[in-house]
Curated annotation (Swiss-Prot):
Belongs to the bacterial ribosomal protein bS16 family. PANTHER family: 30S RIBOSOMAL PROTEIN S16, SMALL RIBOSOMAL SUBUNIT PROTEIN BS16M. InterPro entries: Ribosomal_bS16, Ribosomal_bS16_CS, Ribosomal_bS16_dom_sf. NCBIfam families: S16 (TIGR00002). Pfam families: Ribosomal_S16. One of its GO terms (molecular function) is structural constituent of ribosome. GO terms for biological process: translation. It comes from Haemophilus influenzae (strain ATCC 51907 / DSM 11121 / KW20 / Rd). It comes from the Bacteria. Keywords: Ribonucleoprotein, Ribosomal protein. One of its GO terms (cellular component) is cytoplasm. This is Small ribosomal subunit protein bS16. The keyword Ribonucleoprotein applies. The keyword Transport does not apply.
Length: 82
């Protein structure tokens, strides 16, 4: 099953997440099919906090991909801002 979920990057105590389309059997930070955005939970100043390619997310959902709970809330936030 294909899932759209967060993949953690960044340094210790400074998380940075890639929003990726991945097989649900793959490790959290492992192999993925496509990167569709990023999320920076500790963005400060004029740094960009969230960027999602909604067109690609909608494409993958139409193909049967499921969204993780956190990504679903981020997509809703991005749609509201757009």
């Amino acid at each position: 099953m294909v899932t759209i979920r967060l993949s953690r990057g960044g340094a210790k105590k400074r998380p940075f997440y890639q929003i990726v389309v991945a097989d649900s059997r793959s490790p959290r930070d492992g192999r993925f099919i496509e990167r569709v955005g990023f999320f920076n939970p500790i963005a400060q100043g004029n740094a960009e906090r969230l960027r999602i390619n909604l067109e690609r997310v909608n494409h993958w959902v139409a193909q049967g991909a499921s969204l993780s709970d956190r990504v679903a809330s981020l997509v809703k936030e991005a749609q509201k801002a757009a």
